[in-house]
Design a protein with these regions (language model features):
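Short pre-catalytic strand/loop immediately N-terminal to key active-site residues, enriched for Gly-Thr
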Residues: 11-12, 191-205
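Conserved phosphate/ATP/ADP-binding segment of small-molecule kinases
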Residues: 117-191, 225
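Glycine-rich beta-alpha junction loops
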Residues: 10, 37-39, 81, 109-111, ...
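Short, small-residue alpha-helix embedded
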Residues: 146, 200-224, 228
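Conserved N-terminal subdomain of the carbohydrate kinase-like
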Residues: 2-105, 109-117, 256-260, 264
Length: 269
């Protein structure tokens, strides 16, 4: 199996590609990358970071890949910094995704009830168009509300049901409720929920950890019903370890020591 991860590369602060590449690779799946931007650190709490938009470089990269005959079993998109980069993912799906391959979209746009700086209603509309082409979409609660055009207080079950208008397999992540954090997803025409205990605090990269492990699980042959509990438990274990061991949470999850147990569970050991 071969996965292409399309996301930004933050040199410091574990998120995006610095989570996707090790997590997917550790699961025995080839992971190639297409960086959408290069940052000195991620933007969650750091000041003075550098940002290099790589949009203009992407066509040259893809032109060379075409000469190599590259194709992918999964294309997994995360942070896309412009509407043009959404078009790039659509092009990748058309030109580089194998027959029967899957497009997994993590529609990174916002959190805590608002869009991230620089994201506009026009971008949201374009992201909806991408989600309509995707096999799996993994928004957090805020992103799910913007995609479905429902109020921010909408519950996870309603959001997952509403998002079926966009994609056959919506997976709403990070829904906090009654001391638990829940994932809502569609399975056999029913909205299902998987919950784990909430750990107080904000943990950068948690969404990337869940999405990357989910892609790895699918690539390893797991069904959505099998993958979501495994990936939710893996993400929770990473968060709990980080709460104990990481003083400055901006630097991301301590996921490395949880990878081996996760891989063993994927293999059924």
């Amino acid at each position: 199996m071969r996965v292409l991860a399309v996301n930004d590369l933050s040199c410091v602060g574990k998120c995006s590609l610095t989570v996707a590449l090790p997590v997917i690779s550790a699961c025995g799946v080839t992971c190639d990358v297409l960086p959408t931007a290069l940052l000195s650190t991620h933007t969650g709490g750091f000041e003075g970071y550098t940002f290099l938009d790589l949009t203009s470089e992407l066509p040259s990269i893809l032109k060379q890949w075409k000469t190599l005959g590259l194709t992918f079993d999964f294309i997994y998109s995360g942070y896309l910094g412009s509407e043009s980069q959404i078009d790039t993912v659509l092009f990748l799906q058309k030109e580089f995704l194998k027959a029967g391959g899957k497009l997994v979209v993590d529609p990174v746009m916002g959190d805590a009830g608002k869009l991230y700086d620089g994201f506009t209603p026009s971008f949201v509309q374009k992201m909806r168009a991408l989600c309509k082409k995707a096999d799996y979409v993994l928004p957090n609660r805020t992103e799910a509300c913007f995609l479905s055009e429902l109020p921010l207080e909408t519950d996870g079950k309603t959001l997952a049901a509403a998002l079926q208008k966009l994609t056959p397999c919506p997976i709403v992540t990070g829904v906090e409720e009654e001391g638990e954090i829940s994932v809502y997803y569609q399975s056999e025409n029913t909205v299902r929920r998987y919950a784990t205990p909430t750990t107080q605090g904000f943990f950068c990269g948690a969404g990337d950890g869940f999405a990357s492990s989910f892609v790895a699980a699918l690539a390893g042959g797991k069904t959505i019903e099998e993958a979501i509990p495994l990936c939710a438990e893996f993400t929770t274990a990473c968060i709990e370890r980080s709460a104990r061991e990481v003083e400055d949470k901006r630097y991301g999850l301590n996921f490395e020591k949880e990878l081996f147990p996760f891989v063993k569970k994927l293999k059924g050991e």
